[in-house]
From Swiss-Prot:
Family of the protein in this entry: Belongs to the PlsY family.
Protein topology in the membrane: Multi-pass membrane protein
EC number: 2.3.1.275
UniProt GO BP: phospholipid biosynthetic process
Pathway(s) of this molecule: Lipid metabolism; phospholipid metabolism
Subunit structure, as described in the record: Probably interacts with PlsX.
The name this protein goes by in its record: Glycerol-3-phosphate acyltransferase
GO CC annotations, alphabetized: plasma membrane
GO molecular function: acyl-phosphate glycerol-3-phosphate acyltransferase activity
Keywords: Cell inner membrane, Cell membrane, Lipid biosynthesis, Lipid metabolism, Membrane, Phospholipid biosynthesis, Phospholipid metabolism, Transferase, Transmembrane, Transmembrane helix
Function, in words: Catalyzes the transfer of an acyl group from acyl-phosphate (acyl-PO(4)) to glycerol-3-phosphate (G3P) to form lysophosphatidic acid (LPA). This enzyme utilizes acyl-phosphate as fatty acyl donor, but not acyl-CoA or acyl-ACP.
Major enzyme class: transferase
Amino acid sequence: MLATLMFILAYLLGSISSAILVSRLFKLPDPRSNGSNNPGATNVYRLGGALPACLVLIFDVLKGTIPVWGAYFLDLEPLALGLVAVAACLGHMFPLFFGFKGGKAVATAFGSLLPIGLSLAGLLICTWFIMVAITRYSSLAALVAVSLAPLYTWLIKPLYTLPVTFITVLIIFRHRSNIARLFSGNEPKVGAKKAPTDEKSDI
């Protein structure tokens, strides 16, 4: 019963789209229909600059961290804790309050992994930066980092490997359009002057 309640609360919290709310606060275009059409920090940065993007990023991370920390302190078993993290990500991807049109949940997924340990967070961040430096593809860096997350978790806290694997599968599924563009050579690189506006090129 408690796990079910936390699952619902995590989904509802995840459904609060900070990208849309911050864009309205700063009188920016709706990120769902402008830029890359992705309501996330990257697109908000494209539409409005660093300050609103940072606010979106922080809130999206907290959407994952807060419910998982709550589940952790309520002593939910690892599988239930993982489902809470998945619920937060699902809320971000398919927000109840915004027509079920959400983002890709990379920041929210990262936030949901923070309670496992800062060492895991550090490994994921380092992996992302290394891959961006090598390939210049932000989406590929995110995919590699999230794909390695179960391995990192197994090395640090093995009991959470299965829940983290759930999140990995969810994030990869959400990035299927990016994967297709990577294979076709049409995925924009970091620092490109102009990304296609008719495709969801954000991570």
